[in-house]
Structures are given as structure tokens and as C-alpha cells.
Amino acid sequence: VLFGSKDILCLDFTSGDISGALGKYNKKGITVTDCFRSDLPEGVYEDGQILDFDRLVEILSNMLSENDIGSIETNAVINSTSIVMRDAILPKVSHEELQAIIDYQIDQFIPINPEDYVVKFLDLGTVIDAGLEKTAVLLIGVPEAMAREHLSLLEETGLKPGALDYEGNAIAKLIATGGAVNYTIPEVTCVGAVNLGYKHTNLSIVENGVLKVSRYIERSLDSAIKEVRKVLPSMSQEEIKAKLISLPDIWSSLDADSNDVEVVTAAKNGLNEIAESIGFIFRYYQTRENYVPLDYILIYGIGSQINGIDKFFRQTFEKDSYVLRSMENVKWDEDINLYANAIGGLIRLSEVKK
């Protein structure tokens, strides 16, 4: 782990918004100085791809100016369906030698053109294979062009590029170091972290602080919004989003004469689509060798602001479920659920340095 005495910036990029966290990580935990976010208009950023570079430079420059942020070391957290991941078992050697093996033999692990991807690894620990100690790793391959675009974006806005991180890794680091969730939920063995975003959902399964599974799900809060639009066709996306967040409780039954009955029913239909995809991944995880049962589900992102969303997950999956609001070792006075990935990205590990 790399500790720093100065604040750094971490930006989390999604199709719906950019969120930023300014702070530092040390042995006592994470100290957050400031957090900020901005929604992104259509046609600017989609599925990890920068569609309108100049417009994104303008938006990010305005964000930095409004928050008095100048030239500072900056990490970026990204996710995309184009990012490939594979488990592999490698010889028990140093991290430098592991990376050399991966670089030399990458096409044996992942069916990609090595020249088109930047491939790094996460150390999942020691395993016994055919009587020998070996190292289990999770390989993460980011398209070279995607990595280069994001680093160019940081440079164009006057920032100093640091590490390019992956969403699943960022939230895993936060869970591993953050301590008790919401000050009352103790640290456990296995957590399913659900980033319920506006344009995508991400499920990361973190076992003993190590990322085991991470999947990008294209169904998202937008799925619920589309269902609600069928009953409220005159409302804009932003109005429907605000309506969903203002509902008293998405899970509790409403009076039959309530004007919100149709809205809640429609929203649940959209949420059920997301839950179906999440359930498929949970079932896949349960088939893995040395499977560790899930202790609880942790919900964050814009969709976590829907009242009763924790009850929806609890009833749907029959697992304790909580909305992430704070963590014992994260010093920040406000809810962290919109900034969890960015805060996790402040923690720098040698294997995710660019």
C-alpha cells in the first residue's frame, strides 16, 4: 500500500455522471477533504468510451474550477463491458515476475490481442495446485485506447495522471479498509456490493477484502425510469428520477387510492429486471470452488437514494441488505454512497499503478 501525506484527487467516471473525492489514505484510514459530482448529458460518455472529448474536457474543467482544484495528482476509476477479466493460477513468485509472466503469455489467459489491452492483476492469495503452492490472480484487461483516452483527459484539464483503477477494485479496497459500515454493521467475510447507477449497475463480490467477482450489468436505474414513463409519459427522465427518490418507501404497500401506486408498481418492475441479472451472478458465484456464503448486500450509487431500496434487496434475495452511508475508517461528515468508488480509488496499491 502506498501512503501519501498530501491530498490526491480521484474521479469516478460513469455513463451518467462524474464523481470526485479529494483526500488521502494513511494507516488510520481515509480522510476525505471534499466530494463533488456532476451529471453528464447524453452523447458525452458511454460504457467507458469518451464520445465527445471536447465537451467532457469542458464539463470536467468547470467541475474543477467550481471546487477550486488545480493541478493535482489524480486517479481515475472506470468500468466498461469492454474490460475483460479472467481468473488464473500462476507460479508463486514476486509481483514483478508475475507481471512479466502475464505480459509474455497473456494470449494464453485471455483471448485478446495483447497489443490492444493493458493487462494488470490482483493477487487473490496462495492456493495449492497439484501439491504445489501457487498464486491465484484476477487478470483485468483494459483496452489500450480507453486507458489512453482517460489519461489524456486528465492531462487536458491540467491534472497530473496517477493510477487508472477499475470500479470493482476501488470498492473492494474501500470495503477492505473502511471498517464497520454505518458505524454499526461489523466487518464480515463476504459482501456483495451493488452500485445501482443511472446507466449501469455493477456487482462486486468481496471476500476477506479481496475482489472475487465483478460484473458490469447494463440494466440500471434507467430500467425503472423507463417503466415509470409508461404510466407518466409527460415527465422527463430527471423528473421521474426525482419522483422515485421522493417516494416514501418503494417496498411498503401503499393505500389503494394513493396516486403513487402505479408509479411504485412500475418502478418495481424495472428493479426486478436488475435483480434478475444480479441473481444470475450470485448463482454463478455459488458454483465456484471454495465458495464462501454472502454475509450481506451493500447498496450504493444514485439508486441507493430510493427510500426502501434496502428492503427491496432484503426481500428479493433473502439477505441482510444495507444502504452504504458511512464507514468507521472514512472521515467525512456526509453520506458516502454517491462517492464510494472515488473514495476507494484514493487507496493506492502497487498492482493498480499505471
Where are these regions (language model features)?
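Glycine-rich phosphate-binding/hydrolytic loop that grips phosphoryl groups
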Residues: 170-173, 178, 304, 322-354
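Adenine-nucleotide phosphate-binding core of ATP-dependent small-molecule kinases
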Residues: 231-234, 242-294
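Glycine-rich phosphate-binding loops at beta-strand->alpha-helix junctions
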Residues: 292-316
